């Protein structure tokens, strides 16, 4: 235990304080993949332009036993249940991403896909809200669904529909759905005014229903308690819905609602360390702060300033500048809980991203109890979280499926883990799916492109195993806030500088060393006068000071410039005084990382290390080309 603690402290010192450096990540590719994931989660009749070809129609009789059409919507995660509360939060945050960064989405060719993803959800919500005071909040139940491991196209589990009404209220569910519809009405205001008006009509009705008939939805839909329990209650959703209805309508009624109920409903009292499908206060506080910065506080300015104080305490806690800070892993990732921690990473990163822009708009810094934070520093923090997700972490693992080379291959997801229904229509039985597909150790037959899995534990450890649902199960609400962050990071079209400042290097920042001719000859080496086909380029990407000592982060790129595949690789590294990631140590040398067995012609691999000295001496001591 002592050695583990020592190592953790060392890594905290070395990584936790790292300031953001310019990254080589392809945010545009990550954005495209993260939006594509929603097509894999679709329920209902799939459209002709469906891009995830291994999926097919499913849930075609949902709602029939209740006399209502509930075909459509999204499966929330790796199961086949349609849970209304997280689905609505997913749609709300997708809409917020589009509202803030629609220009960037459009310039990168993804706005249409993002809007389609929203409409797939809102079309379902319209069906689920057949009367002003009736809302269907779940189709299927977790208990029977989790007993089986089947493709959604042929599931045999119970598809009962569950609703809330005036006698069985659910203010949190109705409030969140009202927020989703209101936010979506903004998204469709220009492209489809009539649809926007329809969404707004549902939003008004749902808010009135939520506010008039109060109660927690999981007291009415009790089958949801084990899976999406409403721990925070419904006051946050009522404020959240009012905030979005004000954004959509500019109606003073909703502004007054936020002003008059902020204190009694917790909007001005709760200082949060999370934002997600259950707890909305940080989101409410951020939206109200935006209203205040736009000069629209009016008679409620004093109350709105208290909202803003709580929003800024949340932002300060993200950067370790508050009296109560959000915990992070040694590698620097926000850590809230073991089960699907990544949902809190993306949602907090999104709030930090939009707040950095709000601060820039109002030309002010964030005043924290432990020091001030500039808008660019807040954006740098969001970027650091995204870069961690995409592979800049102690394991050099991408937690977005299909991005990079080292990403999860055994995702806890029924559809991706079973051969596509379009390829093999042989029936997969309820329990047979566990025996044949869940328990197999190979990679998923269908790549769940863009899925953001639950992620590592508190010590940056991760096990890519299908039964490790806490870490390998994805969810729609993991991806939704990420859309906005990625869109913001891609370009500077908002007018804010995307080239974030870095620390000027003290040692020589770039060292390019051709690998020497190998001593042994598994293949014929090049002539002595010829350059080696395996080259190494080192670059100092960041530096920071801790307790008077300067630490440096180096990125090392090894490139195969030959016309053949590099099969055997031995790297000699000397004068290394800190941790290294992205290679495997074998004896006194290093080789390919565990997820790589060879390096094709023209390709490169990267590994990184941190220490408080000039670059280490890195040489290729042996290699084989085939």
Swiss-Prot record:
PANTHER family: ENDO-1,4-BETA-GLUCANASE. Residues 515-536 are annotated as: Disordered. Pfam families: CBM49, Glyco_hydro_9. It comes from the Eukaryota. It catalyses: Endohydrolysis of (1->4)-beta-D-glucosidic linkages in cellulose, lichenin and cereal beta-D-glucans. InterPro entries: 6-hairpin_glycosidase_sf, 6hp_glycosidase-like_sf, CBM_49, Glyco_hydro_9, Glyco_hydro_9_Asp/Glu_AS, Glyco_hydro_9_His_AS. Residues 1-23 form the signal peptide. One of its GO terms (cellular component) is extracellular region. Gene3D superfamilies: 1.50.10.10. Residues 526-536 have a biased composition (Low complexity). One of its GO terms (molecular function) is cellulase activity. It comes from Arabidopsis thaliana. Glycans are attached at residues 560, 622. The keyword Glycoprotein applies. This is Endoglucanase 19. Belongs to the glycosyl hydrolase 9 (cellulase E) family. The active site is at residues 79, 412, 464, 473. It is an enzyme of class 3 (hydrolase). One of its GO terms (biological process) is cell wall organization. Keywords: Carbohydrate metabolism, Cell wall biogenesis/degradation, Cellulose degradation, Glycoprotein, Glycosidase, Hydrolase, Polysaccharide degradation, Secreted, Signal. Its EC number is 3.2.1.4. The keyword Membrane does not apply. It is found in: Secreted.
């Amino acid at each position: 235990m002592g050695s583990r603690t020592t190592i953790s402290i060392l890594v905290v010192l070395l990584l936790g304080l790292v300031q953001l450096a310019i990254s080589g990540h392809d945010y545009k590719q990550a954005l495209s993949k993260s939006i594509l994931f929603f097509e894999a989660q679709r329920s209902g009749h799939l459209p002709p332009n469906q891009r995830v070809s291994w999926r097919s129609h499913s849930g075609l009789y949902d709602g029939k036993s209740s006399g209502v059409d509930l075909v459509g919507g999204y499966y929330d995660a790796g199961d086949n249940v349609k849970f209304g509360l997280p689905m609505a939060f997913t749609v709300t945050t997708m809409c917020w991403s589009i509202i803030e960064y629609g220009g960037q989405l459009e310039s990168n060719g993804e706005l249409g896909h993002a809007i389609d993803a929203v409409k797939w959800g809102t079309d379902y919500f319209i069906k689920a809200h057949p009367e002003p005071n009736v809302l269907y909040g779940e189709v299927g139940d977790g208990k029977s669904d989790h007993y089986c491991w089947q493709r959604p196209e042929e599931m045999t589990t119970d598809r009962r529909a569950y609703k809330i009404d005036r006698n069985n209220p659910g203010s949190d569910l109705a409030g969140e759905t009202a927020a989703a519809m209101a936010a979506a009405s903004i998204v469709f205001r220009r492209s489809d005014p009539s649809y926007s008006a329809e969404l707004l009509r549902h939003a008004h009705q749902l808010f009135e229903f939520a506010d008039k008939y109060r109660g927690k939805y999981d007291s009415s839909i009790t089958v949801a308690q084990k899976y999406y329990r409403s721990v925070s209650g419904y006051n946050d959703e009522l404020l959240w819905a009012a905030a979005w209805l004000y954004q959509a309508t500019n109606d003073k009624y909703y502004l007054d609602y936020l002003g008059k109920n902020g204190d009694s409903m917790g909007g001005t009292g709760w200082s949060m360390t999370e934002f997600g499908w259950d707890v909305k206060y940080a989101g409410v506080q951020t939206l109200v702060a935006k209203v205040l910065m736009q000069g629209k506080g009016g008679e409620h300015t004093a109350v709105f300033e208290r909202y803003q104080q709580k929003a800024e305490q949340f932002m300060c806690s993200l950067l370790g500048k508050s009296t109560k800070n959000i915990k992070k892993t040694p590698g620097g990732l926000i850590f809230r809980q073991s089960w699907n921690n990544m949902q809190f990473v993306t949602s907090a990163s999104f709030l930090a991203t939009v707040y950095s822009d709000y601060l820039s708009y109002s030309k002010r810094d964030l005043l924290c109890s432990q020091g001030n934070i500039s808008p660019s520093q807040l954006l740098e923090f969001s970027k650091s979280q995204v870069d961690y997700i995409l592979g800049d972490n102690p394991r050099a693992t991408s937690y977005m499926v299909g991005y990079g080379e080292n990403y999860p291959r055994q995702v806890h997801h029924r559809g991706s883990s079973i051969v596509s229904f379009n390829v093999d229509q042989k029936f997969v039985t309820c329990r047979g799916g566990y025996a044949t597909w869940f328990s197999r150790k190979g990679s998923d037959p269908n790549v769940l492109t863009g899925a953001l899995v639950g992620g590592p534990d508190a010590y940056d450890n991760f096990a890519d195993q299908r039964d490790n649902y806490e870490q390998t199960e994805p969810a729609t609400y993991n991806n939704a806030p990420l859309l906005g962050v990625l869109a913001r990071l891609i370009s500077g079209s908002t007018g804010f500088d995307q080239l974030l400042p870095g620390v000027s290097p003290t040692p020589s920042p770039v060292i390019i060393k051709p690998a020497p001719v190998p001593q042994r000859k598994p293949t014929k080496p090049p002539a002595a006068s010829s350059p080696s086909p395996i080259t190494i380029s080192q670059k100092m990407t960041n530096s920071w000071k801790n307790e008077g000592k300067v630490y440096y982060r180096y990125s090392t790129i090894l490139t195969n410039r030959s016309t053949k595949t590099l099969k055997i690789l031995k790297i000699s590294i000397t004068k290394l005084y800190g941790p290294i990631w992205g290679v495997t140590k074998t004896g006194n040398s290093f080789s390919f990382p565990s997820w790589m067995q060879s390096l094709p012609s023209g390709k490169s691999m990267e590994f990184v290390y941190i220490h408080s000295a000039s670059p280490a001496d890195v040489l290729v001591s042996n290699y084989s080309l085939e």
